[in-house]
């Protein structure tokens, strides 16, 4: 054993243990014994349920889609109802209504009451409270089509619908019609995380904010409500910038300086002491992400702060969101990837930011927050 590091000794042992365990778990006799034993029955059933949920996940999402499209949650917003009352409103037969209600209740979207009425349960109420969730449920119809043949997607053999939906993934960033749909979707989803980001960092310590890739202005509008003293700027592509001007004007926020352009263009030097990139970097491959960070560095005053908020691949307890969901969503989109915190930290450091650190946020599965200072 002389000359071997501790890690080189541990690794083979760990691999032998994993191989032995996998052979055991894959043995049908062990599976039956584990399911029958009072000592292991709970674990065996839980894992069997987890495996079945993986197989049935598409069915569950389609049940949610049916609830959204039929506006079932809105129908129950004022209180519980009988299936017979709902059938006419949903334009379904009584049998189909019962089937949907029971299915939704099994997924904790609805709650079945003892008198055969149904009410919203926690998940259904959450969808109702966050219109952006329903918008994404509808939007996922594109993703499901792209995932019809996941092997072809992995091999790059298909032209995906998502890449057509996101115009900058196909080089159509100046097409106003193409930008309209995705800009509206992003504006809705920004509302879900804006308050979390504002709670995570003291924006009031700054004089001027530039939101790069700010879309239609949902985030800067939330900042304006919380910090009316901040001078606000937004940068996005020309068709999106015009939509931002119109949207912000209707909210009484014409004071926001909306700039039409790209982060690939030279930025006005020292134009803000706080720059934000809210769910921007993960949409782009490394070369474009570095360009966005260079633009942020150019725009910041010396010592100014860059704030990055986006889903990260290694968020504790939400690994499947970063690695599985965003991993395949961005593959279908044709651009970007969810990065681990260490990867983003390195990108920020390479772009000239020091003291990069993570800030706690309420729902890090949707947006984890990193900050760094320009040096």
Each model region followed by its residue ranges:
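Generic structural signal for residues in well-ordered beta-strands
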Residues: 110, 118, 232, 256-258, ...
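C-terminal alpha-helical "lid/dimerization" subdomain adjacent to the S-adenosyl-L-methionine
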Residues: 307-351, 356-358
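Conserved Class I S-adenosyl-L-methionine-dependent methyltransferase catalytic core
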Residues: 30-207
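Eukaryotic partner-binding/assembly regions in large regulatory complexes
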Residues: 2-28
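Conserved beta-strand edge residues that scaffold enzyme active sites
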Residues: 117-119, 313-314, 362-363
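Conserved adenosyl
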Residues: 130-317, 365-368
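Core SAM-dependent methyltransferase catalytic element
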Residues: 352-375
């Amino acid at each position: 054993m002389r000359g071997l590091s501790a890690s080189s000794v541990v690794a083979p042992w760990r691999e032998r243990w994993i191989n032995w365990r996998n052979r055991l778990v894959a043995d049908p006799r062990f599976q039956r014994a584990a399911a029958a034993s009072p000592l292991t029955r709970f674990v065996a059933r839980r894992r069997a349920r987890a495996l079945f949920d993986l197989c049935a996940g598409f069915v569950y999402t389609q049940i949610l889609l049916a609830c959204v499209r039929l506006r079932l949650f809105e129908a129950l917003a004022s209180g519980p109802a009988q299936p017979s009352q709902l059938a006419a409103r949903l334009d379904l037969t009584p049998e189909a209504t019962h089937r949907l209600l029971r299915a939704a209740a099994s997924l904790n979207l609805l709650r079945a009451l003892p008198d055969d009425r149904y009410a919203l349960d926690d998940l259904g109420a959450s969808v109702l409270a966050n219109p952006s969730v329903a918008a994404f449920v509808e939007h996922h119809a594109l993703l499901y089509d792209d995932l019809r043949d996941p092997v072809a997607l992995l091999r790059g053999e298909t032209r995906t619908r998502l890449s057509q939906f996101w115009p900058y993934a196909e080089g159509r960033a100046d097409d106003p019609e193409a930008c309209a749909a995705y800009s509206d979707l992003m504006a809705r989803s920004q509302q879900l995380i804006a308050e979390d980001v504002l709670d995570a960092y003291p924006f009031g310590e700054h004089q001027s904010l530039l939101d790069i890739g700010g879309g239609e202005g949902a985030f800067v509008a939330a900042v304006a409500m919380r910090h009316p003293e901040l001078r606000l700027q937004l940068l996005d592509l020309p068709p999106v910038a015009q939509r931002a001007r119109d949207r912000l004007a209707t909210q009484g926020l014409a004071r926001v300086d909306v700039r039409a352009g790209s982060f690939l263009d030279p930025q006005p030097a020292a134009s803000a002491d706080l720059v934000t990139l809210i769910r921007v970097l993960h949409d782009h491959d490394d070369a474009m992400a570095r360009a966005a960070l260079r633009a942020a560095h150019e725009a910041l005053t010396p010592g100014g702060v860059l704030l990055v908020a986006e889903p990260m691949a290694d968020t504790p307890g939400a690994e499947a969101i970063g690695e599985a969901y965003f991993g395949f969503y961005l593959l279908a989109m044709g651009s970007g990837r969810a990065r681990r915190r260490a990867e983003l930290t390195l990108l920020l450091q390479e772009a000239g930011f020091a003291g990069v650190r993570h800030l706690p946020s309420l729902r890090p599965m949707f947006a984890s927050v990193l900050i760094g200072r320009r040096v």
